[in-house]
Amino acid sequence: MRRLIQLLCIAMLAVWIQPQAADAAKAEPVTEKIIFIPHDSRPISSTQTADVVTKAGYEVVVPPTELLGSREDLGHPDQLWTWVHENIAQPGVKAAVISSDAMVYGSLVGSRKHNESRAQILARASRFTELHRAHPKVPLYVFGSIMRTPRTGEASGHEEPEYYRRYGADIFRYTLLRDKEEVEGLSRRERKEYEFLMRLIPKEALTDWMGRREKNYAVNEFLINLMRKNGTFHYLALGRDDNAPFSQTHLESRHLAAVGAELGKTRFQTMAGIDEIALLMLTRAVNEQRHEVPFVFVRYNWGRGADTVPAYSDEKIGTSINDA
């Protein structure tokens, strides 16, 4: 009889505990989270961007500031890889918005000034495959940059190698002519100018600048191919900052767009700008989680309107808005 009473008490306790546990679960829902790794520690890139999505009801999980790069600190990519693997497994993570520049070079400025080997940066880029394989249910929204081409040394803002302050305008003009030659050809006068610039710009400076660009182009091409062949990313965007309608940035963008053309704009884009792309990617992640498709209608003022080409862009503002 005593045994029977004990069993009845245990059964009653179990019946009482289950609703309590269910009520506790309802009372403390897991907050939906988005992992966000910005391309540097500037507020416009990190905290201000994250705050927008926080106000939409999400917890935005961002690495400690000391892991993010700045103008003085090029960043800590290997530590960021450790951080993302530790944090992406948190309960409630719905998506990850990640700067490839941060994960490969340490930061946006790091992508412009690094001295890493091609093998090293491609090895870091390949770790996206491992991340996707380990967490296949977390969509990866990855954004990177196509290296910029400032018009002058002064316009570079100390974010290019030191020689760019002296030869920046010449390097810009040299790449303008390279790009134009591919698109529409050069006049005899432009051909002579091109040959003159090749003699004027120190060979070691041009080799360093173009060599770094070649490595960064290889990384961007590698990321596109990860998307094409393996579907590693849910969405991939490459931004273009500080360039012109004819420039090395425009040339590389044309080539990369061709590599990823078959993916379509719902999976891959190159677009004008870079600092705003993180917010675009976070917004895309939120809209897709909520299955919402917002529509935005733009009206331009009198004048050139949509045909205006901003001073630091390679395309009409109307094209930039449509791509966004």
Question: Where do the language-model regions lie?
Answer:
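Bacterial N-terminal signal peptides
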Residues: 7-16
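An N-terminal assembly and electron-transfer interface module characteristic of large anaerobic redox
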Residues: 25-324
